[in-house]
Amino acid sequence: MIEFLIGLIAAVVGILVGYLIARKINNANYEIFLEQAKAKAKAIEFEAEGILRNSKISVQEAEFEAKKAYEDKALKLQKDYNAKFDEISKKEQTVLTEQEILKDSREELEKEKKSAQTIYDEGTSLKKTYETKVEESLKLLERVAGLTEDEAKSEILQKVEEKSRAEIAHIVRKYEEEAKKEAKRNANYILAQATTRYAGEYAAERLINVVNIKNDDLKGRIIGKDGRNIKTLEMISGVDVIIDDTPNAIILSSHNLYRRAIAVRTVELLVEDGRIQPARIEDVYKKVSEEFEAGIQEEGENIVMDLGLTKIHPEIVKLIGKLKFRASYGQNALIHSLEVAHLAGIIAAETGGDENLARRAGILHDIGKALTHEFEGSHVDLGAEICKRYKENPVVINAIYAHHGHEEPTSVESAAVCTADVLSAARPGARREVLEAFLKRVSEIENIATSKEGVKQAYAINAGREIRVIANAKLVNDDEAVLLAKEIAEEIQAKVQYPGEIKVNIIRETRAVDYAK
């Protein structure tokens, strides 16, 4: 039993040992197999990568070959296209050239066709004319053959009359030429008569007046303390007062004759009175201005009376007096108008016109010049407007327009005024062009200043090198005065041509007055 148990145990132990040994052997084989499997897997992976690389290379080579083939084909197609395009362009140019040649040929053909048609038409016309003449000749022969004696005489007289008309036309032209020569001789005779029968006084206007004083001590009194007197006089009169080394003389300068005349009379009265101060200067200037206004009316009435004219409106009479203080090209406007009036009257009388009406038109032909300092526009339009307003004779209005070519003269009197105007203005020495240009420039400068808002008066002084502007203190303050000066200076610079520079001087003054009772 024990032996059986020992044998059984030994058998169990043997089996267990065998199992363990077998298991160990199996584990060793498994690891070997695993390593072999891994090695095979790596070999397969490496082979797959090689195949993949070879595939990529093959694909790239295929793409490159395909791209190259495409580019070669595209280049070939482009070359073929360019060749075809050049060929088509050449053919198109050839076609255009042939079209131009065809067009020119067609135009030449049309010209030749028209020329041939013209020749044909002319030939047809000549043929018709020839046939007409033949028919007329045949009819004439038939008519002559069948004419009576009276009919033949009538035919002859008709031919003679036609021939006589040509001779009469020649005679008329001859006498017309002789009449024109005679009219020219008569016109020259009338002009000679007019110029020799009238000799008016004349002196060219100047830009200065000289006031004589007793001694040079008065110059200091006229200047006044700190120049107050001379500044006041220049400001209210708009005239340059020049006090220099000239002994016993004060010079007044201005382009405006009226302002200068008032200033001259004011200085004369101040020197005569001896009281020279700003308030006194203003009083005397105001008094002299009123006297001149009355004197203008009286001057106009005297001129109208001397010319023997009647029924002229008082406003027009006043304007006639104002012409004394106007000048054109250095020629006094009133003296010029008087010359025109007298010459026009003589010419009208010689040519069968109304002498008094011609004088009336002559004295009024430049009446607009009395208004040019106050209103815009030409003196022709201003003069015609004032005469229409006061119902002047239509001949006078026509003369105003006609003497500057705005209308044709419609009467003997108007033509006489035009002729007299040329005689008075065009004679040597009557006018000075340079002076007129200067006066026009100075007037334009003053007009620019007075056109601004807040400006009461403006005077150009120092030969137009300075413009003195009197501003309204209620409308213009100190800051606005600076802007006003700049604005006037800029407009003068833009619109007026002048040498050197022009000083714009704005004067703004405030006065307060009260009375102690």
Swiss-Prot record:
Record Gene3D superfamilies: Hypothetical protein af1432, K Homology domain, type 1
Membrane topology: Single-pass membrane protein
Domain HD residue range list: 333-426
GO terms of molecular function: RNA binding; RNA endonuclease activity
This enzyme's EC code(s): 3.1.-.-
Family: Belongs to the RNase Y family.
Database matches in NCBIfam families: HDIG, RNase_Y
Record-given protein name: Ribonuclease Y
Native source organism of the sequence: Campylobacter hominis (strain ATCC BAA-381 / DSM 21671 / CCUG 45161 / LMG 19568 / NCTC 13146 / CH001A)
